[in-house]
């Protein structure tokens, strides 16, 4: 209560443009939503998926696949992580996203976690989803982030799932809570109808999937997108589904897209013995080539040595698609990162220069706190929201995945607000980009198949 009062006072005396994290009482309240919804997510998700699969007449471990057109040869797709602020830090990427999506090789787009800030609500979808995506003509799929779950995923379902799956999911969620819900069935149907109206008005090809997770399978490549909810967990139905999809992808190049990353800010975030650690250990043992996730709002890369034919599990943290920048990585990178090969964007020098130039006087005590004692006793990352700059230069990014059976390779390329991001834009260590032209675009090229798979 006291925190909300303080936030209210600060809001009343500060001029706020766009989305602001520390000076937005709804965002403060979302902390309460997280505490309430977190433990319920697995039950909700399992009920939703079970009901939809039953309605479709499919076993749950054989449902929820999507099939974009044009994947019978070489193709590309975009992955945009944590986009949904609806302010300049999201909009600055719009022209580059549209330019890349306009390439005929790009067949679909995936939004990866936190589609709508601060609390995943329907009222924010037009500003934070449809307007920024206007002009995008390729199919759009998504996995939710923790913020999308704060309203029990109702708005995500209405906008990203097929209308039938959305209504079934929303009813199933209410059912598992014994009917304790703020929405009547008529209101659910009205929300779904409004989502259909907005998709039509803005020309967005969404509402194509039937669950908050899905897979895309071609003869050579598999994308398996999973939802790790609020607390980095998956229910039994989703876990069994993922295992079945991994089994179906044996012998293929497998990329897993998740809501939360294993490595972030130069640290292994998976505590040993936890379900979350078990998820990533499973990917390593199963021969997955690439793990990608968002949640932290920047770009990071880690090469994890693993046993098996590939020898490396490549981790991409791809969360720079629109939310405020996570400053902890560049300003508090550890001396001993968890993998020998690593990279992150923006560089420490570039971010420090912006902080020195753009930090207003009343925030200088926070900047001094970071520079002198690394924000002790909290972390630098804890203070990221204070530095939610809505002015250039921005350090947002997204990724393109180019799947080329004709060349036997998969290429991961990094894009920013002005086009290709270059090796000179990153801080990096180990073999990451070793010997690369500093002015060349950041790309990681991997073989589609390796001996022994």
Describe these PLM feature segments.
Residues 1-102, 107-110, 148, 158-254, ...:
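Metal-dependent phosphoesterase/phosphodiesterase active-site architecture
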Residues 143-153, 258-261:
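Short, solvent-exposed turn/loop segments enriched in Gly/Ser/Thr/Pro and often Arg
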Residues 141-145, 290-293:
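A short beta-strand/loop micro-motif in the catalytic core of glycosyltransferases
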Residues 133-137, 283-284, 307-310:
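Short, conserved loop/helix-junction motifs that constitute active-site signature segments
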């Amino acid at each position: 209560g006291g925190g909300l009062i303080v936030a209210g006072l600060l809001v009343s005396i500060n001029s706020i443009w766009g989305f602001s994290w520390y000076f937005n009482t709804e965002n403060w309240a979302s902390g309460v939503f997280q505490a309430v919804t977190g433990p319920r997510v697995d039950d909700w998700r399992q009920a939703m998926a079970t009901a939809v699969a039953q309605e479709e007449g499919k076993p749950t471990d054989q449902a929820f696949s999507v099939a974009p057109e044009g994947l019978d040869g070489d193709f590309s797709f975009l992955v945009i992580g944590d986009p949904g602020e609806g302010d300049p830090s999201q909009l600055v990427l719009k022209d580059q996203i549209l330019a890349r999506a306009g390439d005929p090789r790009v067949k679909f787009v995936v939004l990866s976690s936190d589609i709508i800030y601060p609390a995943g609500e329907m009222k924010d979808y037009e500003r934070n989803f449809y307007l920024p995506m206007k002009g995008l003509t390729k199919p759009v799929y998504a996995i939710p982030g923790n913020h999308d779950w704060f309203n029990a995923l109702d708005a995500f379902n209405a906008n990203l799932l097929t209308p039938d799956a959305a209504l079934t999911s929303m009813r199933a969620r209410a059912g598992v809570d014994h009917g304790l819900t703020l929405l009547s069935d008529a209101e659910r149907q009205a929300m779904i109808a409004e989502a259909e109206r907005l998709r039509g008005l803005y020309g967005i090809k969404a509402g194509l999937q039937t669950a908050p997770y899905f897979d895309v399978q071609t003869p050579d490549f598999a994308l398996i997108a999973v939802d790790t909810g609020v607390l980095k967990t998956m229910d039994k139905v989703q876990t069994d589904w993922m295992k079945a999809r991994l089994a179906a992808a044996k012998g293929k190049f497998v990329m897993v897209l998740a809501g939360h990353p294993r490595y972030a800010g130069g640290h292994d975030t998976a505590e040993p013995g936890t379900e979350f650690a078990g998820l990533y250990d499973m990917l390593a043992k199963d021969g997955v080539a690439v793990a990608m996730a968002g949640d932290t709002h920047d770009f990071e890369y880690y090469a994890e040595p693993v046993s098996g034919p590939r020898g490396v599990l490549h981790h991409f943290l791809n969360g720079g698609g629109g939310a405020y920048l996570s400053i902890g990585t560049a300003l508090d990178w550890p001396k001993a990162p968890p993998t020998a090969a690593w990279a992150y964007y923006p560089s420490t020098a570039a971010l420090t220069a912006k902080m020195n130039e753009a930090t207003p006087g009343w925030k200088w005590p926070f900047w001094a706190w970071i520079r002198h004692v690394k924000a002790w006793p909290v972390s630098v990352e804890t203070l990221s929201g204070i530095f939610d700059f809505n002015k250039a230069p921005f350090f947002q990014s997204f990724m393109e995945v180019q799947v080329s059976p004709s060349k036997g390779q998969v290429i991961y390329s990094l894009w920013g607000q002005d086009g290709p991001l270059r090796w000179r834009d990153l801080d990096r260590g180990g073999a990451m980009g070793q010997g690369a032209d500093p002015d060349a675009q950041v790309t990681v090229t991997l073989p589609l198949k390796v001996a022994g798979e």
